[in-house]
Amino acid sequence: MDVLLYFGGDIQDTQENMKHAGSKAYIEWSLENTAKILTISFPKKHVFLIRPSRVLETLSYFDNFVPSKEYGIPVFCPTHNALKHLQELLKSSVNRINMYNTDKELTHLNIEKAKLTLVGFSKGCIVLNQLLHEFHYYQNKLDPDIEINNFIHLIESMWWLDGGHAGSKDTWIVEKSILESFAKLRIDVNVHVTPYQVQDSHRPWIGEEESHFCNILRNLGIPIKRTLHFADKTRSLQNHFNVLKAIWNYTQ
């Protein structure tokens, strides 16, 4: 069973909630439409979109995965039980699907045999970054948590799509010890960025941190796949969202 878990960005919400003035122009990127886009790029995967625990105006807060300040700025910590929450959320979703699965030809989903792909877009990348902290935490725990360690080993790949948030640091994880723990897991790493984030002259730390993140992992022997999209185009929010479609060429 191949499963993709998606964490979206600010503005992204259900079509119904995006009909108001602040989001209407971006309804193309509603969660329903994003699910269709991801299904085209990952046709063999069951796609789950995980909504933020709350949305204030157009700002997303993933409080159940990572502590956040004003504007959804993350405050990373060794553990916020994000992995446990993700595991329980997936279990609950799979159980519900199996309950309503009346088609005898469809195989019931089994989480213990799942191959997981985690995708973060824009603000949603803060969840992936918190998971990196938790990988480190569980690897160094004196009393190993076998259940969580087994869950971690279901994760085959992680995709960072143009990560960004309103804070002035920690857009990308650059602590070497945390990335060393991550590298030991041999998870496939995919980074797709656009000038909207990594070439923002008002937020130069984003590009600097992204470069450090990629370089540290490469130096640790991880064959990271990194792509800059729309390099010849003017920085725009539209092309920031377009990265969701652009990854299609890299998933076939």
Q: Which ranges hold each PLM region?
A:
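C-terminal catalytic histidine-bearing segment of alpha/beta-hydrolase fold enzymes
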Residues: N190-Q252
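Serine-dependent carboxylesterase/thioesterase catalytic core
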Residues: I97-I187, V198-S201
